[in-house]
Amino acid sequence: MNLWLLACLVAGFLGAWAPAVHTQGVFEDCCLAYHYPIGWAVLRRAWTYRIQEVSGSCNLPAAIFYLPKRHRKVCGNPKSREVQRAMKLLDARNKVFAKLHHNTQTFQAGPHAVKKLSSGNSKLSSSKFSNPISSSKRNVSLLISANSGL
């Protein structure tokens, strides 16, 4: 009886020390359900997205939007009109950033690299930028109080 108990203990210790082998494969980070409803205010704050295809343990086609605040993810139905609109917005935004990044040059100044914009005209129209003075009542009141002191 003692020999049988000793064999079970040895087998138990060897099983605990042996590395675990997972037959399931790689862990997949995927959406299992859609967030509903997703507001346009949330979708336009996303900084990027990716399309989830149906494969492996991910059994739902989805658009995963990555939000900058607290590294949150929002899963949307890729057939939804708001989700498609947000994907087009992000594609256009990334295209503009890629063009701006293409127009930069890197100069080596000592141990630090400095990026400098090219001397060419900017591709962004001036209508994209709002006037900071007219957009905020606080800025207007600051200008009035600064001018009254003259």
UniProtKB/Swiss-Prot annotation:
Q: In which tissues is it expressed?
A: Specifically expressed by thymic dendritic cells. High levels in thymus and small intestine.
Cystine pairings recorded for this chain: 30-58, 31-75
Q: Which GO terms describe its molecular function?
A: CCR chemokine receptor binding; CCR10 chemokine receptor binding; chemokine activity; chemokine receptor binding; hormone activity
SMART domains, per this entry? SCY
Cited InterPro entries: Chemokine_b/g/d, Chemokine_CC_DCCL, Chemokine_IL8-like_dom, Interleukin_8-like_sf
UniProt-listed Gene3D superfamilies: 2.40.50.40
Q: What is this protein called?
A: C-C motif chemokine 25
- Gene name linked to the record: CCL25
